[in-house]
Each structure stands twice: as C-alpha cells, then as structure tokens.
Amino acid sequence: MNRRTLLTGLASLPVLPLFSGFTLAADSPLSAQPPTRLAHPPSYWRDKVSAEAWKVLFEEATERPGSSPLDQFYEPGNYLCAACYLPLFRSEDKYDSGTGWPSFTQPIEGALGTKLDFRLLWPRTEYHCARCGGHQGHVFNDGPAPLGKRWCNNGVALRFVPADQPLPPLRG
C-alpha cells in the first residue's frame, strides 16, 4: 500500500458513520432462519427490564468491566436476551477471556444479527438479539481455537437459566 492510499483511507474514516445506516450497518443474521423480528419500539421494553439493562440493550451503552456477576459464573445452562428471552448462548461455549465481560466462543445459530460500529473510529462488529434488536456486545477475532472468536457480552443484557429449569416463554 502506498502512502497516498493510506492517507486517503484515514481521511475518509470520520465520514463513515454518516453512511453506517445504509450499507455498513445493515443487520446480517447469523443463520438462514433467524427468529421472527419483533416490531416493538425500544420504549416497549422500558418497563420490562432494569434501567441499566435498557440503556445497554436499546441505547447501546456498555457496562463497566467486572461489574456483572455473570462474568465469573460457570454453571450449566443457557444465556437469554434479558428483554425478549430468546436463547443466545449455551454455557458450554462460555469462557474466561480476562476482559471483565461474559465471553463466549459462539452464539446459538440464528440468535444474533451483526452490524459495523464506528463509534471508536475503527470498525468493530457489534451484535444484537435477532428477535428484539437489543444490543448485546461486540465480537472480536481474538478468541480461543478452534473458532478464534470472542463474543464479548454485556452481562446486564443477559438472563441466565440453569440447565435443570425450563426456559421461560418468549416475551414480546
């Protein structure tokens, strides 16, 4: 890559967020058969989740690292979207990434959609619940083998259901 190409690319970074609502941020389901997407506005969920969860899920905030009890929690079960209760992750895919957030090697197929996030200037892959659209976290390419992915989740955006308990009905 020559210097001119590099400088042109760097100079264009500040305008990329202006276009992210079109091609760069289009939801891309992780499976050919994602769950049916709900049409509720974010305000629908405000009285169904905590204020902190609502900020993360529907304003795309991030909880402080180390603040979630789910970070160092390793019981068998399933991790659901805190808003609509769609199962997102299985406990056997959870691992300690050392980041201070619950991390997983892979989601349940079809449970999440992704989009590019440019809030820190460089692109990151953000992921959302495929059903209610609630923001969960970001996926990085520094996870353990064999998949090499780290699905880094906000704990407040999750609800854990132990393996010996039935899953609650979907909400919404």
Task: Locate each region found by the language model.
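N-terminal secretory signal peptides and thylakoid transit peptides that target proteins
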Residues: M1-P17
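C-terminal segment of N-terminal export signals and the immediately downstream linker at the start
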Residues: L18-V56, R64, P168, G172
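N-terminal post-signal-peptidase region of extra-cytosolic proteins
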Residues: L57-Y74
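Mid-length scaffold segments of soluble, non-membrane domains
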Residues: Y74-S103
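Residues immediately within or flanking Cys/His clusters that coordinate Zn2+
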Residues: N78, E126, K149
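Short cysteine-rich clusters marking metal-coordination/redox-active sites
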Residues: C81, C129-C132
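Cys/His-coordinated zinc-binding microdomains
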Residues: Y85, G133, V156
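Short, non-ligating residues that shape and space the ligands of small metal-coordination modules
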Residues: R90-S91, H138-V139, V161
